[in-house]
Design a protein with these regions (language model features):
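Caspase-like (clan CD) cysteine peptidase catalytic core
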Residues: 22, 64, 75-100, 105-166
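Cleaved targeting-peptide boundary
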Residues: 21-29
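Positively charged n-region of N-terminal signal peptides that target proteins for export
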Residues: 1-6
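Bacterial N-terminal signal peptides
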Residues: 7-19
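Glycine- and acidic-residue-enriched helix-capping/strand-helix junction motifs
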Residues: 36-51
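Cofactor-binding loop segments of dinucleotide-utilizing enzymes, especially the Rossmann-like FAD-
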Residues: 30-34, 70, 100
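Signal peptide-proximal N-terminal region
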Residues: 51-65
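Acidic/histidine-rich, surface-exposed loop or edge segments in extracytoplasmic proteins
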Residues: 28-39, 60-63, 131
Length: 166
């Protein structure tokens, strides 16, 4: 009888651990309030956004809250954060990714856009103006690349998981 009770308790413990893991609520915030002066981009009110959003996420039970802010939110910083998020999610998790930064259209490189333009998010290290041989958009986060990250995260979440992007 004692062994049976121990097995049941152990099984319930594992079920609680696994079900808790399967329902983690995660947030990745990308917030850029101050771009470098030489970039050509104006300041935003991303700090206000984040303080309000963070309180809301905490009230809604989000426990894994990550922030990639200002100087950390370079192209490399954002893509590293997206890869880290992708690797940490489990089936059934809820993930919210929020961007508070500039955006810009730019020439479509692979011909998949009917209007000939890609949409791009503007990381901290992206320049506003194209200049051949100097800055050709290599630090812009294009919609095609973002789509790849979101698709990979969505696959890892499985059918019960949720992915929100704002």
């Amino acid at each position: 009888m004692r062994i049976g009770r121990s097995v049941v308790l152990l099984g319930m413990g594992w079920w609680l651990v696994l079900s808790g893991m399967a329902q983690t609520r995660r947030v990745l915030g990308v917030m850029i309030a101050e771009y470098p002066p030489h970039s050509g981009w104006s300041s935003l009110h991303a700090d206000n956004d984040w303080s309000l959003l963070r309180m809301s996420f905490l009230r809604q039970g989000f426990s894994d809250i990550r922030l990639c802010k200002d100087k950390e939110a370079t192209y490399q910083g954002i893509t590293t954060a997206l890869r880290g998020l992708r690797e940490s999610v489990n089936p059934g998790d809820t993930v919210w990714i929020h961007f508070s930064c500039h955006g810009q259209q730019m020439e479509d490189l692979d011909g998949d856009e009917p209007d000939g333009l890609d949409e791009a998010l503007i990381p901290y290290d992206a320049q506003m103006y194209y200049e051949k041989g100097v800055y050709e958009g290599e630090s812009h986060l294009r919609d095609d690349e973002l789509h790849t990250y979101l698709t990979e995260i969505r696959k890892r979440l499985g059918g019960r998981g949720k992915l929100w992007v704002s």
